[in-house]
From Swiss-Prot:
GO terms for biological process: cell division; chromosome segregation; establishment or maintenance of epithelial cell apical/basal polarity; microtubule bundle formation; positive regulation of protein targeting to membrane; regulation of autophagy. This is Microtubule cross-linking factor 1. Residues 1-508 are annotated as: Necessary for self-assembly, microtubule bundling activity and apicobasal microtubule organization. Residues 1-249, 1678-1773 are annotated as: Necessary for colocalization and binding with microtubules. Residues 22-40 have a biased composition (Basic residues). The modification Phosphoserine is found at residues 77, 87, 217, 221, 263, 549, 618, 685, 776, 901, 923, 1278, 1385, 1388, 1399, 1421, 1514, 1523, 1561, 1578, 1583, 1592, 1661, 1679, 1683, 1791, 1808, 1812, 1814. Residues 1-329, 544-563, 601-631, 671-694, 737-800, 842-867, 1080-1100, 1346-1384, 1485-1505, 1524-1569, 1655-1689, 1707-1756, 1782-1842, 1863-1905 are annotated as: Disordered. Keywords: Cell cycle, Cell division, Cell membrane, Coiled coil, Cytoplasm, Cytoskeleton, Membrane, Mitosis, Phosphoprotein.
Length: 1905
């Protein structure tokens, strides 16, 4: 024991010396393992092991050896030898050792030793225990001679307490600790011994020592169990301190080697042995001791350490004897020595075993480690591969970014790249399909493996159970034998044989009970298994019914009905059998229970009889007595019970076998899917057992049927091939050989083409050899198989015959086919009725059946609304024809009694299916088509599926949108629909034979009929229908979104009650507008045919539209059409935007609901607290009441009337309680009433506020109308104004402006105010008045607009069209009008505007547009500027609220932007949108170039408007406003634009821009919570709303730059919310740049301003801009002083824009750069706008941001939206070519136009880009476009330019847009190269100042937005 302990302890000490794990490992490994290791082949795992071993060895020979020896050898061998039974203990000890050693290896080694110990222990259990007692002590003594005394005590205490007697107890006392100590000591000794050998380089010794240590370690486990604490103490040196300390002192040197880690005492023990032997000897001795206790000789021989070992044992023994002599008598010492010898021999044996185990373990560990290493290497390789791939992808990404940038610069689309990308996409799709199939197969394999695992697990469990039963039997036999012996002894002892017998019987009964219990458990388990199997069978059955849909294609080939029937039958039989067996089991259990009860009775009886029988003779003959009889009876019962148990066992095994069979069958069922072509062959295999003859007959019948049907199919295929060829030829003649790819035609998205393709799509579809677009191989295959008419009849026919025959075999297939056809007929009827209703609606709407928010624009835009009813009519007619055909088909099906299906119809339907899949690919439901493809494919392989597929295909075609779920369901349920046929195969065969000829004829007839119908049903009709439905769906979704937003607004209004009333009305506007769009309100729409398309493009037509605006919209819609068809991606983007807006809205809802929940929780808490307080108060009152009652009782008692007083008190208390309850309920009611009255009052207040806003808007609109009319009259009176303005209005509106003008804008000029420009008209009227009074009013108007932004919020929606209309009006008109109109919205502002108009400082807008910058009135007087600045400051922070605008606005922006974009493209420069881009831009434009405004009118009609619209692009809100404003400006407020027309880009566009901004901002003021997005909301509904605010924003272009800046900042402050603040800041910055002072300088200043503004303005609020303005027009906004001022002015805004400011202000992006570049290139603003620059700046910078590949230095540095904008600015200065600017504008316009998806806003952005050569413009446009596309306004704000840029770049690449932009630029250049161009983003303009400002504005706009 000591030895064991010693090794254990030694292990611990070693651990101290070294990591125990290492020691142990070494010990374990060292002995034999070490040798083996030397010869072992190198393995990747080994290096680690070697290192570990080497390290342990390195620490010190003693340590390593000690580690090795102690861990396994010393402890284990003694323990094992000494205590076989303790083997488990030894295991535990090794566990401890391993833990201490940290030994992974140790742990591994230990288990094996443990095992060895068990084996040894098992054999020597008894001996082991006794020896353990004796030997353990002896061993320790002999081995270590160290603390034998101590060890013996522990061992003795355990093993031979009796023998040692007095000695043992002392040993125990000291022992437990001592053994622990000793264990360490021994271990140390062993370790030292091992170590010494190691030192001596005695491998053998080391091995032996390690072996010994191993052996001891196992034994240790036992001792350690007993002495775990002791051993640990010993290790620590505490346990062994008693005796060992002395030794420790002497032995420190020897022990130091092995035991030093251990406690000093172990070293002491070791010291003696070590001292006895040489260093090697000592080592050998310890090893000998540890390993050789049992037989030192053996150990020596084995390990070659015999001499040292023996000396060692001797030495240790003597010391141990000496120790023991102290503790134990000499006699015992001899006995101990003998025991030690025995243990030594045993230890040697065990050591050998341990060596083997250790070697095995090492090998295992090596293998494990090798696996790990290989795995690691594999992972590393994978990592390397992934890194390489990443690098490659990064490289590709960089290349792609460079390409895209190049494309953006050159505007050329790389068709080859697109084609290659398409090819890559196809390949990727095919790969994904293939991978999907592989995944399925892998999944199946995995399921199989899992099932196998489960069965194996069950088998293991069964084996365990049987093993347990056998063990129980063995134990019972043992016990019975023992009992027999004991009974004999009892007889001998004269115990009553009765009792013995009864005891024996009781034991047997107990065993029987246990067995019965086991059986019950087993039976229950079997029952559970049976239930599970039954459930699985049930599941599989249910699955099997639907095999077709759920199963993979391979399994779904079509469930052969015969095989299914057989399997079902067998399943039923099996289930019945299982039920019978289950019942039997239950019966047996009942019987078993009865027997048990009988046994219990018998036992009780016996026990009762027991006392009486005591008298019975005790002779063995007692069996003859009564007791003997009862016992014999019991025995008989027991035998009976055992027999019953045997029967149960047998039945259970039978049931298990049966279950196994079932599970096997089930797994076969599951994992052996029928081979598709091989149904016939397989049919019999699964359930072949009993129905062999039947199956043979079935096979023959199937073969016959397959032959017949094969012939039929071949004929049909040939027939169809001929028909399809003929049709193809016809179609080729018809369509000019466009047949090849219906999908290609789709991509072209020509409505006519689609129709023609629809015809050919069915036939030509098969022609496609390879996947087109997004098709996959499976789809291609599907097409081949699905269309008999496919070019390869052989391909189609080959797979089909057998499958078709199989499918036909089931009459059920026919039934399901009939059901499907009927369902299809019903669907067709529904479709026809729907189309009729559509036609009716279309008639009502005048040709705009589905005016959606630009959703329907795809086809109808080009065709015009009138085409829709016709198209629907043709669709309806064709659907009716199809219905007739379907009815004929149903009749034919009815005639065919059998399962034969009319193949021609199938063919058609299959072709339809392929068409559907192709269509669906193009359509938003493309995924559906792709999913259907494979499903349908698998089904088409069966005839029945062919039949169903076609019908379904038709249905899908017609109902792609409506029936998406049905499609999925059918696709999956095709086979499911085919139930098992009621008819037998024989009847089917008979029917096949009889009806063969009839069918053939009918099929031919049917194929001809189908051929006729093929031409009727064109695929374009289907696509048109789908698109209409899609549009209606989108519209409905959008309406739902708007209503949700309205609801949310109401909700918040109810909650907040402050400015929410205004927000509420604004919220309503979008809804109203959307409703208008939905209804197709066509006041203006009907007026002009072209406008119908434009209306659609706009999304929400407004009642009044100017024809011009319609024209613009029409063009836009055309662009959208081409873009949409060419790029289904646009739809995806729009959908994404819509749904992202939805998501944002839902998030808002969730936030509101959470707030409500929180409020509810607060109320609950309050209620709980109040209630608790009330309870406390009530308790207090109750106590007082009781006290009072007691007092009163006492008094009353004294008085003698206690009873009465009690009654009175009770009554009184009850009354009080009642009163209290009543008062409580009253209080609660009152509280509730107050709460609700407050709510109602809040609601009423909000409603009143809304009403007030609406009334005020109405007043404003009327006022604006009057003003506008007066202005018009004045213009008519004044030849210059009248001619240019009116003409511009009319002509301009018709030309480019029509595009800009939204549908709303089309409303006549007179009606303009009514165009929902509630606030705008109001403001516009003042503006127009101002314009009339003073042409310089444009600048003022900007300023006033900025001031009046508050009023504009609600008007914006209506105003937008007006503004757009105005934009259309000649810029001269706008200049004439002057932006001051807007100022009127604010009464004080209107007064101010009038003053401004009169003021000499303002340049006149009335001046001819041709007037040059010189004409511009001087900037406002410093006083005026200060006043404006003050005013702006007052307003500055209000707008912050407005910025919370959400997704809805983005959505609206998208639609509107798309429309605006179209309009913009029509106009060379959408000035208004440009201004919209940033209020600053507007202000700057207006202020910068009154002359620009004047000049701009010339090209403003086209260019200015477009610029404005494009400007819209940068911010979605701005976009909307812009599109509306541009269009509106052109129309009703062309005057405003005219005012700005000199700088129409600046002035006119500024108006629209400002209008939008104001719209945004006023709303923002109200909707600050909702933010700028809300302004977008109104744009959502229509651009009308924004138009008016924008117009209002238009300030007189004559305002001085400073004034404009101030006005703009004011407007921004008013209009923009937090988000808008940024815009304002940016606008301010832009304005600042424009405000630069001199118009000419403006351009240069623009750069500086942009920088300073960016640095300051961007970061700071509009106040900053105002501050620079206050500084004076002379100071460029970009000037540092201004920027500083601006920062000081608006800290709050600075915070908002801080992020932008940082980048912008940083030297990288820093205003310094901008200042430098813009200033030096002040003359090059146009150049900046050069296409390269613009694209670079706007597309690259924004793009670079998005891609993180920043080619341009500026872009690279710039990380946020502002920086990108700045980069754009930097770039724009670089290019000076007006032409380049034009290119850039073109590219922008392209981006906008390709963006048609985005909407007019996008185009506007594009135009504005064209207008403003500055990259900033581009950036803003990009932002707008991006926002329009689907990026939220936030995106626009942050990095919209970049992100949008990437997408926009592609669209910008549109050549048409480029050309258009170039044209516009040329026009611009021609019209106003001077200031005008700069204002109108003079792409063509050489006037740098304007362009610079515009660029700056653009930059600012994206930021602000």
């Amino acid at each position: 024991m000591e030895t064991l302990n010693g090794p254990a302890g030694g292990g611990a000490p070693d651990a101290k010396l070294q990591p125990p794990g290492q020691h142990h490992r070494h010990h374990h490994l060292h002995p034999v393992a070490e040798r083996r290791r030397l010869h072992r082949a190198p393995s990747p795992a080994r290096p680690f092991l070697k290192d570990l071993h080497a390290r342990p060895a390195a620490p010190g020979p003693a340590v390593p050896s000690s580690g090795r020896a102690p861990a396994p050898a010393a402890p284990r061998s003694p323990n094992l030898a000494g205590k076989a039974p303790p083997s488990p203990g030894s295991l535990a000890a090794p566990g401890r050792l391993s833990r201490r050693s940290g030994g992974v290896p140790g742990a591994k080694d230990k288990p094996p030793p443990g095992a060895g110990a068990r084996a040894a222990g098992g054999a020597k259990a008894a001996l082991g225990s006794r020896r353990a007692a004796r030997v353990a002590p002896a061993e320790p003594l002999s081995r270590a001679g160290k603390p034998p005394g101590a060890e013996p005590p522990s061992a003795a205490a355990k093993g031979r307490k009796a023998k040692r007697g007095s000695r043992a107890p002392p040993a125990r006392t000291v022992g437990p600790p001592t053994p622990a100590a000793r264990i360490p000591a021994v271990t140390l000794a062993v370790t030292s011994v091992a170590g010494s050998p190691a030192r001596c380089s005695r491998i053998s010794h080391t091995d032996s020592s390690s072996d010994l240590s191993d052996c001891p370690s196992e034994p240790l486990s036992d001792e350690q169990r007993l002495l775990p604490a002791a051993s640990s103490d010993a290790e620590s040196g505490t346990g062994s301190s008693d005796r060992e300390p002395p030794r420790g002192a002497p032995t420190p040197s020897p022990a130091a080697r092995g035991a030093p880690p251990g406690s000093p005492e172990p070293p002491a023990l070791l010291a003696a042995p070590l001292a006895a032997g040489a260093c090697p000897g000592g080592r050998s001795i310890p090893s000998g001791v540890s390993g050789g206790f049992a037989g030192p000789g053996v150990a020596e021989d084995v390990r070659g350490r015999s001499p040292p070992e023996r000396p060692v044992p001797g030495t240790p023994k003597e010391p141990s004897l000496g120790e023991q002599s102290r503790l134990v008598p000499a006699a015992e010492e001899e006995e101990l020595l003998r025991e030690m010898e025995e243990l030594r021999s045993e230890n040697d044996y065990l050591k050998d075993e341990l060596d083997e185990l250790r070697a095995e373990m090492e090998e295992m560990r090596d293998s494990y480690l090798e696996e790990d290493v290989y795995q690691l290497q594999e992972l590393r390789r994978e990592l390397d591969r992934a890194n390489k791939n990443c690098r490659i992808l990064q490289y590709r990404l960089r290349k792609a970014e460079q390409k895209s940038l190049k494309v953006a610069e050159t505007g050329q689309v790389d068709g080859e790249l697109i084609r290659s990308l398409e090819q890559d996409l196809k390949v990727a799709k095919d790969v994904s399909v293939r991978l999907h199939h592989e995944l399925k197969t892998v999944e199946e394999k995995r399921a199989k493996a899992e099932d196998e695992n489960e069965t194996l697990r069950q088998q293991m469990i069964e084996v365990e159970i049987s093993k347990q039963a056998l063990q129980n039997e063995l134990e019972r036999l043992k016990e019975s034998s023992l009992k027999r012996r004991s009974t004999r002894e009892m007889y001998k002892e004269k115990k009553t044989f009765n009792q013995d017998d009864s005891a024996d019987l009781r034991c047997q009964l107990q065993f029987a009970k246990e067995e019965a219990f086991l059986m019950r458990k087993k039976m229950a388990k079997l029952g559970r298994e049976k239930d599970e199997l039954e459930q699985e069978l049930q599941k599989y059955k249910s699955l099997y019914g639907d095999v077709d849909s759920p199963l993979p294609t391979g399994e779904a080939g079509g469930p052969p009905s015969t095989r299914e029937a057989e399997l079902k039958l067998r399943l039923k039989l099996v289930e019945e059998e299982a039920n019978i067996l289950g019942r039997k089991i239950v019966e047996l259990e009942v019987e078993n229970r009865g027997l048990k009860a009988e046994m219990e009775d018998m036992r009780g009886q016996q026990e009762r009889e027991g006392p009486g029988r005591d008298h019975a003779p005790s002779i063995p003959t007692s069996p003859f007595g009564d007791s003997l009889e009862s016992s014999t009876e019991l025995r008989r019962h027991l035998q009976f019970v055992e027999e019953e148990a045997e029967l149960l066992r047998r039945s259970i095994s039978e049931i298990e076998d049966h279950n196994r069979q079932l599970t096997h069958e089930l797994s076969k069922f599951k994992f052996e899917p029928p081979r598709e072509p091989g149904w016939l062959g397989e049919g019999a295999s699964p359930g072949a057992g009993g129905g062999a003859p039947l199956q043979e007959e079935l096979k023959s019948a199937r073969l016959q049927i397959s032959e017949l049907s094969g012939k039929v199919l071949k004929l049909q295929h040939e027939n169809h091939a001929l028909l399809s060829n003929i049709q193809r030829c016809d179609l080729a003649a018809h369509l000019g050989l466009r047949a090849p790819s219906p999908r290609d035609s789709d991509a072209e998205s020509d409505a006519g083409k689609k129709e023609s393709d629809g015809e050919e799509s069915r036939l030509p579809q098969p022609k496609r050899e390879g996947p087109v677009g997004g098709e996959s191989d499976s789809e291609e295959m599907f097409e081949k198989t699905s269309g008999f008419g496919s070019g390869k009849p052989s391909e189609a026919s080959e797979p089909c015959p057998t499958e078709l025959l199989k499918a036909r075999e089931d009459s059920e297939y026919l039934v399901t086919l009939k059901h499907e056809a009927q369902r299809l007929e019903r669907t067709v009827e529904r479709l026809i009725t729907d189309t009729d209703s559509f036609l009716h609606d279309a008639g009502l709407r005048g040709g705009a059946p589905l005016p959606g928010p630009g959703l329907q624009g795809e086809e109808e835009q080009g065709e015009g609304d009138q085409q829709e009813p016709q198209l629907l009519g043709t669709i309806n007619a064709k659907m009716k024809a199809f219905k007739k055909e379907l009815q004929a088909f149903l009749e034919q099906v009815n005639r065919i009694g059998d399962g034969l299906s009319p193949l021609p119809h199938l063919t058609e339907s299959s072709s339809f299916l392929s068409t559907v899949t192709s269509v669906s690919r193009d359509s938003p439901i493309g995924n559906l088509g792709k999913e259907l493809g494979p499903d349908l494919q698998s089904r088409l392989k069966e005839q029945l599926e062919w039949q169903l597929g076609p019908a379904r295909g038709d249905e899908r075609e017609s109902l792609r949108l409506r029936a998406a779920r049905e499609l999925h369901r059918r696709a999956d349920g095709d086979t499911g629909s085919h139930g098992l046929g009621g008819q037998t195969c024989f009847s089917l065969e008979m029917e096949e034979e009889h009806l063969y000829a009839l069918r053939w004829k009918e099929l031919e007839m049917h194929s001809l009929a189908l051929q006729n119908t093929l031409h009727e049903r064109t695929w374009s009709d289907e696509k048109n229908l789908m698109q209409q439905e899609l549009r209606s769906l989108k519209q409905n979704i959008f309406l739902f979104y708007v209503k949700l937003r309205w609801l949310l607004k109401h909700w918040r209004q109810g909650k907040q009650m402050e400015e929410e009333g205004e927000e509420f009305t604004e919220g309503e506007h979008p809804e109203t507008l959307s409703r208008l769009g939905e209804l197709g309100v066509q006041g203006g729409h009907q007026a002009d045919g072209p406008d119908h398309d434009s209306d659609r493009g706009c999304g929400f037509p407004v009642g009044e539209h100017s024809p011009h605006s319609r024209v613009q919209i029409g063009d836009h819609s055309l662009r959208l059409q081409t873009a949409d068809r060419g790029q289904p991606h646009k739809q995806v983007v729009e959908n994404q935007q819509l749904f992202s807006a939805f998501k944002a809205l839902l998030e808002d809802f969730r936030a509101e609901l959470r707030e409500d929940e929180r409020a509810r929780l607060r109320l609950q808490q309050q209620y709980a607290s109040d209630k608790a307080a009330w309870d406390v108060e009530w308790a207090v009152l109750k106590c007082r009441l009781e006290q009072l009652e007691e007092k009163t009782e006492n008094k009353l008692g004294e008085l003698g009337s206690s009873a009465e007083s009690k009654g009175a008190l009770k009554k009184e208390r009850e009354v009080h309680q009642k009163l209290l309850a009543d008062s409580h309920s009253l209080v609660m009611d009152l509280r509730w009433q107050i709460h609700h009255s407050e709510k109602n009052w809040n609601r009423e207040k909000v409603e009143l506020l809304d009403r007030l806003d609406r009334d005020r808007q109405e007043w404003e609109r009327q006022k604006k109308e009057f003003l506008w009319r007066i202005e018009q009259l004045q213009k008519e009176n004044s030849p210059r104004r009248g001619g240019s303005f009116l003409c511009d209005q009319k002509d301009g509106n018709v030309r480019p402006f029509p595009h800009q003008g939204s549908l709303r804008m089309p409303r006549p000029v007179a009606m303009w105010p009514c165009a929902d420009a509630d606030s705008i008209p109001f403001e516009d009227r003042p503006l127009s008045k101002l314009k009339e009074s003073d042409r310089c009013s444009a600048s003022e108007n900007l300023y006033l607009d900025a001031l009046s932004l508050d009023d504009e919020p609600e008007e914006p929606p209506a105003h937008r069209p007006e503004r757009e209309f105005r934009n259309r009006l000649p810029e001269e008109e706008e200049n004439h009008k002057g932006n001051l109109q807007r100022a009127v919205s604010v009464s004080s502002m209107s007064e101010f505007q009038r003053l401004m108009d009169i003021s000499p400082f303002l340049p006149e807008k009335g001046l001819p547009s041709t007037s040059s910058k010189e004409d511009v009135t001087p900037p406002l007087s410093p006083d005026d500027l200060k006043y404006i600045e003050e005013f702006n400051k007052s307003w500055d922070y209000t707008p912050n609220r407005g910025h919370n605008g959400g997704g809805p606005d983005l959505w609206a922006d998208r639609t509107e932007v798309g429309r605006a974009g179209h309009e913009d493209s029509t106009e060379p420069f959408p000035d208004s949108s440009w201004y919209l881009t940033t209020s600053v831009t507007m202000t700057t434009d207006t202020m910068t170039s009154p002359e620009h405004c004047q000049k701009q009118p010339l090209r403003s009609h086209v260019l200015t408007e477009q610029s404005g619209l494009r400007v819209l692009h940068s911010p979605p809100a701005v976009r909307r406003v812009d599109s509306i404003t541009a269009a509106g400006g052109e129309g009703p407020f062309p005057t405003s634009r005219a005012r700005g027309s000199p700088g129409d880009t600046k002035g006119g566009p500024p108006e629209p821009m400002l209008s939008r901004w104001p719209c945004t901002s006023p709303r923002h003021s109200r909707d600050y919570v909702e933010g700028a997005r809300r302004p977008l909301d109104s744009p959502l509904c229509t651009s009308l709303g924004f138009a008016s605010p924008l117009h209002s924003l238009e300030m007189s272009k004559n305002l001085s730059d400073d004034m404009k800046e101030v006005a703009f900042s004011v407007r921004n402050a008013i209009c923009s919310g937090p988000g808008e603040l940024q815009v304002k800041d940016m606008a301010c910055q832009t304005n600042g740049s424009r405000t630069m002072g001199t118009q000419t300088v403006q351009t240069i200043s623009v750069g500086l301003q942009t920088e300073a503004l960016r640095g300051s303005g961007v970061t700071s609020s509009p106040h900053k801009c105002l501050t620079p303005k206050a500084g004076g027009g002379a100071t460029p906004v970009s000037s540092p002083s201004r920027s500083l001022r601006s920062r000081q002015v608006a800290p709050a805004i600075e915070k908002v824009q801080a992020k932008f400011e940082r980048t912008c202000c940083s030297p990288k992006y820093g205003s310094p750069k901008l200042q430098r570049k813009p200033l030096p290139k002040a003359d090059q603003p146009n150049n900046r706008t050069s296409p390269g620059m613009a694209q670079k700046g706007y597309s690259e910078s924004a793009w670079a941001r998005s891609t993180t590949t920043r080619e341009s230095p500026v872009h690279t540095t710039i990380n946020d939206g502002l920086s990108s904008l700045f980069n754009i600015i930097d770039h724009s200065p670089v290019v000076q070519d007006p032409f380049q600017k034009g290119l850039r504008a073109g590219s922008r316009s392209r981006s906008a136009e390709p963006r048609p998806e985005l909407g007019p806003g996008q185009e506007t952005g594009t135009n504005s880009r064209g207008r403003s050569p500055s990259p900033i413009g581009v950036g803003s446009e990009m932002c707008r476009e991006e926002g329009g596309e689907g990026t939220p306004v936030k995106q626009d704000l942050s990095a919209p330019p970049g992100y949008t840029l990437t997408e926009n770049v592609a669209r910008i690449l549109n050549k048409k847009l480029l050309e258009h932009a170039l044209k516009e630029e040329r026009r611009q250049a021609a019209h106003g190269p001077p200031g005008l161009h700069s204002d109108s983003h003079s792409l063509g303009d050489t006037a740098e100042p304007g362009p610079m400002e515009n660029q700056t504005v653009l930059l600012t706009a994206p930021w602000g937005l």
